[in-house]
Amino acid sequence: MTPIRTVHVALWVAYAAAVAAHVGALLMDAELLRRITQPMFAPLLIAVVVTAIPRRTRTSVLMVLGLLFAWAGDTLAGLAAESGQLIAVLSFLAALVCYSAALAPLWNRTRDTLRIALAIPYGGVVIGLFVACADGAGPMLPAVAAYAVALATMAFLSAGGNGMTWTGGTLFLLSSSMLAMDWFLPGAAIAYSGVWVMITYTIGHALLIAGMVHAMPARRWSACAPGAALVIVEN
């Protein structure tokens, strides 16, 4: 294993450890640990992307931008008690737009008819959830509506990529749906919803990023080394 790939794998291990610590903090109601671990998710995923890409591309830039917006949603929302929900919605709305733009070329190249057909109902799920949450959204309704459209678009485009992007997009959709129920439909919230929201969000986010990295034509460890030559052996 090359040194850069070792670092890449170590970053995935660090991400998994941060997620496990965060979920443990939620279960134990350890507020300080929760606040420390959540802002670590996006920077670790950014480092995963940076250690994988052999050169800067449109897709990698969009992935990093999306992760920066996700970091803002994870971090800044918790610092603003009054407007935390709005900051989170707008930050993740921007992240979803970036991810959709990154997924669109992949969807055009490798779309799988079966996965796309299975993803079509996502629009209905998002519309139904939006209608149910509309009354509780209050003044945030326009932002929630824009987020719902971006979420459905990202989930649909993720289905046309590969298995990891599809699973990641689906879990992201599930996480956002449960969070919306928590915020705007308190009576419909499920037990331990906060824990389930973070489990589906962190795994979905990781799979979405991993799927887009996997779809890159080359990674740093698979690119040809400088000066490498093609040798043809004839019998």
What feature does the model see in each segment?
Residues M1-N235:
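Polytopic alpha-helical membrane-helix bundles and their juxtamembrane interface segments
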